[in-house]
Amino acid sequence: ELAISGYPPRDLLLQEDFINGCLEAGGKISTPIPLLVGSPVPGKPRQRPGNGALRIDSDGAVREVTRKQLLPTYEVFDEARYFSPDSRPGIIRGLGGLDLGVTICEDAWQHSGLVPSDYQTDPIEQLAAWTGQGVELVATVNLSSSPFHATKQSSRLAVARAAAKTLDHPFFLANQVGGNDDLLFDGHSLAALPSGEVVAAPGWVEGVLVVDLDDFSAAQWITSDGADAPSFIASGEER
């Protein structure tokens, strides 16, 4: 979530050049595989910008996939001040040959019942309704900037398990690592199956969690320096 700009960008979002610069930076990402990356995206006429997800292909093409639906305005969050919400979750076709649902952070938390809200919609239920109408999704991805507190990973596990169970397919939560102003992001990205099985990455370390949808036990954690460090959390319990 907002990986290109950092979270939260606050009043920088009032500058059109800043948002355009984020999109240009996305186009400069060199990758042999397609990526989903969080970035602010330009607003529609007479609207604030969106908290978006971009598809970046190996040829450098950048396309907007979706925008965040649920904008939190409690505790450290003030997103409704800066963003306009989308009305539905995203679906991305043919990303590495896969069709995926796409949500952004809070979009998945409403379904778990763990956050105070008066939201009028539930993006996870929307995706579940679409799959019930014949939309075939291999998995759903959630791009997150989920700040750290002492029991936060336990909450994330509950969110992911609830979403995977309702959707009846794997649910992936990719969280930021590091600090931005007064917020700390602990990582602990994870993957959950409808059965409740979870594989989670370690905290406070940048890297890639590689998950085989057919065999969660074969998951690998590769650190940012390219070393294979298989100390992931197979059970998903907090450490």
Question: Residue ranges of each PLM-predicted region?
Answer:
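Enzyme catalytic cores with a strong preference for nitrogen-chemistry domains
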Residues: E1-R239
